[in-house]
Every structure is written in C-alpha cells, then in structure tokens.
Regions:
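Sec-dependent N-terminal signal peptides of Gram-positive bacterial secreted proteins and lipoproteins
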Residues: 1-23
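A short glycine-leucine-enriched loop at secondary-structure breakpoints
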Residues: 109-120, 142-144, 285, 418, ...
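Extended, small/polar residue-biased N-terminal targeting/export presequences
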Residues: 40-100, 148-164, 173, 473-477, ...
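Conserved acidic, small-residue-rich alpha-beta core segments centered on
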Residues: 207-214, 220-385
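C-terminal, low-ordered peptide segments at domain boundaries
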Residues: 122-210, 253, 367-398, 465, ...
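Conserved PDZ fold ligand-binding element
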Residues: 110-132, 213-216, 437-447
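PDZ/PDZ-like domain micro-motif
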Residues: 25, 106-119, 172-173, 408, ...
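Short acidic, glycine/serine/threonine-rich helix-capping segments at coil-helix boundaries
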Residues: 399-465
Length: 486
C-alpha cells in the first residue's frame, strides 16, 4: 500500500494545530486510518479522494454549518452568493432518477429555453446524471458564455432534449412594490448585490415620500453579514447594529454601527422559523432599535458566523513549505502573513468553519434561541406552492392574448395556480394551457370566456389575489393593516 506522505503532513498539521495542548502527534495515527480506509473500502480510492473524505469528516462533524467543500462545491456556494454568474440559471437537487430542477430563475437562459421547475435532468450532452451529485451535474452544465449545452429532460408527458445557450444570469435578491402608502420589500437572501438592489428600491420609495415599510424576511437563510449590515444602515437609526465575537486571536472582534440620524421609517418585519443568520442580524437590529416590530413566528436561531478558507493541495503545501520553510494550509495565511498570492491550481477546496457568534444591539445572543416576534401569528401557507406575498397585482392595461410575454403573464399564472385553475409552472409566456385556465376562471366569474386577459379579467384576478392573501397569509395582512393604521 502506497504511503500517503503528503496527506499525512497536511492532515497532521490540521490535527496538531487544533489540539496542540494534548502534546500528541496524530500524524502516524491518521496515516494508518487513511491507509486502512483505502485498503478496506470496497471501491478504489485515490490519495486525493481519501484526503477529501478525511477533511469532510473532520470539519463536517463540528456543527451543522462547518464543512469541507471541493472546488466544484465551492463554485456552487460562490455562485449562490453572487449577484450574477455565467450558466443557465437553474437550481438543482438530487432525486432517484438523477437530478431535479427545483428553481428556474426568471428571465434566465433556462427559462428562455423552456426548462421548468420539476424537470428531471437525465443527461447532460448525452452523459447520464444517474448517481451524480448536483454539484457534479452543475459543473457539467457550466461553461463559457454563448456556448450551448443539451439537457435530456424527463417530464410526466415524456422525455425530450432541450438545448440551452449559456449566458449571464443576474439574480435580484430584492423585490418590492407600493401598496397605497406602504412599501412592501422582500429580501430573498443577502448576496453580494443585495444592498445595491435595496438602495434602488429605497431611492424610489423616498422619491414617493413613503415612510411605511413592510419588510419580508421570511425564509431568508442569510448570507453575507456585510450586506445585511449595509441594509440596516439605510433604515435603522444610529447605534450598534451587531457585534461579532471570535475566539481566535487571528480574527478581530468587530462592531457594526449605523449613523442614520432621525430615521423616518416605520417598519413591520415579517419573520418565520426559516429567517436565519444575517437575516436575524437585520431583524434583531430593527427590533432592538424600537423602530419596528417583528410579525410572525420565532426565527431560526442561527447566531454563529462562518468564514471560508481556501485549502492548499498536498502538493502545494509541500512546495511552499520547502520554498519558505513555513507550513500554512490556507491561502489567507499565505497572503496575510507572507504576501504570497497562490495560483488556483494550488487549491484543493474550501473549509467553511464556524469561527464566532454575534450579539444584537441590546446584547442578545440568539444561537439556538431565535428572535421572538412582537406579534405572533400563524405563518403563511403556499396554495399549490405559490407564495402569495410575492405576487404583484396585474397592471398592464393592454389586453394580453396568446403568445403574450411579460411579467403580467407570470403573475396571472401564479394567481390562477394558487386558486386551482392552472397546473403548470408559471412563466412569462401565455400559451394554450394558460388560456384554458383563464377561460375556466372567466366562466366561473361570469366574464366572457375568451382566454385573454382584458381589463375585466385583470380586475377579477387582482380581487382573487386579495382574497387568497386574506385566507392564506395572515401575517402579511396583519403587517399591512398595522402600517396603514398609522
């Protein structure tokens, strides 16, 4: 059995740096464990696979948020936190048949090609996806802008091949609208462009002289702390926003402040059990400032923060160790301490590690506790999978007919699906399936069943949207009525 010399050095360094007080050399022990795994495991495993498995086990067992990710997985994480990337614009999950599309992004190459939520990807350019992880399939789909990839798709109606031209996918994590004298703002997550998108919404809100904001943070999993802080600085009055407290002396504790004097905004914030992490930082800052109330359910309670560290390959670790006589395993150590910028080929993947926790303005630590709402009310339900709060009322005054394309078509399909008239996946094109659903809706509402969206049909659809919200989203309606009462 081949000795795993460089793996021993790398993993031994990791272990001894974590538990130096024990005064023990775990290198030989770990080397024996790796050799045992390679020898006894029923599938062949090369040195790099063994190392990655060891790192995944080492960091993945620390807590639910820490772990090791190879370069493909790292790319997926980075894409999810960026405002734009080159790809097709679809989120994937593993399923029995292969990999399933769980979300097609609006106005993306995937949507334009006709891909739908729920499509099962059986093959990429003729290569089966069976047994593969979503990250591996995503890597196969990814490519240069302007090139094409052919996906073999399984639907209930049968199998088909769909060619998709890769392109720039821009994800806007902020959506908003005006309802009378209230601005509704939904923040999906805190990606690299969240604060910029939020500022664009605030510019228009300020231009209209609106000071009442219904902020929807439900199901927001968090993201970049800096982005959540940047949003808070636009609406939370001066004072502490949050404090990050780290154990390691290599990371400096940090306090974030707002210098906004005399904030004019009255805030109602919608939260639920999936409001987490950076979203809780924003919600906690609003609650502690006294400028807003939380409405809904207790939040998730993720009060710890993670840092991402790029990890060297064993070869790079040995190369730089020999050259400099130093033994750092992460790129940030080489850059911070020695000014050495590593090549991408030197990197094995990333370690995401829980490094500290945060406190709210009033000193609350919410890890495992969450934020209790000021007004507790049942969370929304999603009729036929539709989030009613995210539907915009129809505004297009022109009659929409077969093959019409645009946002109003998508909003109408969402209303029709929530109301049980439409079984398809809402998109931006009116096809025969859309028109058939409209005819059913028109007939039940005593409107001429043309299948087109005229003024009368538009008004009835908007009325149905209001009725659906009243039935299925009490938190939204409570927040709206509360703000309108002032």
């Amino acid at each position: 059995m081949k000795k795993l010399a460089t793996i021993l050095i790398l993993c031994g360094m990791l272990l001894t740096s974590v538990i130096p007080a024990m005064g023990m050399d775990y290198g030989d022990y770990l080397n024996s464990a790796l050799e045992f795994m390679q020898d006894m495991y029923y599938l062949d495993m090369d040195d790099e696979e063994a190392l990655k498995a060891a790192l995944k086990g080492m960091f993945g067992e620390l807590d639910p948020y820490s772990g090791f990710y190879d370069n493909q997985e790292t790319q997926m994480i980075n894409d999810s936190l960026q405002g734009s990337f080159v790809g097709i614009g679809a989120s994937l999950e593993k399923c029995d048949e292969g990999v399933r599309i769980v979300r097609v992004y609006e106005d993306s190459p995937a949507e334009r090609a006709g891909l739908r939520d729920g499509d099962i990807i059986l093959a990429v350019d003729g290569v089966s996806t069976f047994g593969k992880e979503p990250s591996a399939v995503a890597a196969e789909i990814r490519g240069e802008e302007g090139t094409s990839v052919t996906l073999t798709i399984q639907r209930p109606t049968g199998r088909l091949d769909i060619a998709v031209q890769r392109g720039l996918v821009e994800i806007n994590p902020v959506s908003w609208r005006i309802e009378e004298d209230v601005a509704y703002i939904h923040i999906e997550s805190f990606t690299s462009n969240t604060s910029g998108s939020f500022q664009k919404a605030m510019d228009e809100i300020e231009r209209r002289g609106i000071t009442k904001i219904l902020l929807d943070l439900r199901d927001n999993p968090g993201g970049y702390v800096d982005e959540a802080v940047a949003v808070a600085r636009k609406i939370v009055p001066e004072g502490l926003i949050t404090k990050l407290d780290f154990k390691s002396e290599r990371l400096s504790d940090k306090e974030y402040y707002s210098d906004l004097k005399n904030s004019p905004y009255l805030l109602a914030v919608l939260v639920n059990e999936n409001t987490a992490s950076a979203a809780e930082i924003l919600a906690g800052a609003i609650q502690d400032s006294g400028k807003g109330v939380l409405i809904g359910q207790k939040t998730y309670g993720k009060g710890v923060v993670q840092n991402m560290f790029y990890v060297l390959t064993p070869e790079a670790y040995a190369k730089y160790g020999k050259k400099y006589g130093l033994h750092y395993i992460t790129s940030v150590e080489w850059l911070s301490y020695e000014g050495v910028l590593l090549d991408p080929d030197d990197l094995l993947g990333t370690i995401k590690l829980t490094t500290g926790h945060y406190l709210t303005r009033n000193g609350r630590a919410i890890q495992g506790v969450g934020l209790a709402p000021d007004i507790e009310i049942a969370d929304r339900t999603l009729p036929n999978g539709i989030d009613l709060a995210l539907i915009n009322p129809l505004k297009n005054t022109a009659t929409l007919t077969l093959d019409a394309y645009g946002d109003d078509v998508c909003q109408a399909e969402k209303i029709l699906r929530a109301a049980g008239y439409f079984n398809g996946t809402p998109d931006r094109r009116m096809d025969q399936e859309t028109q058939e659903a409209i005819r059913k809706f028109q007939a039940e509402n005593r409107i001429p069943a043309t299948g087109d969206i005229d003024a009368q049909t538009r008004d009835k659809l908007n009325e149905r949207l209001d009725a659906l919200r009243a039935e299925y989203d009490p938190a939204y309606m409570r927040g709206l009525s509360l703000l309108k009462s002032f």
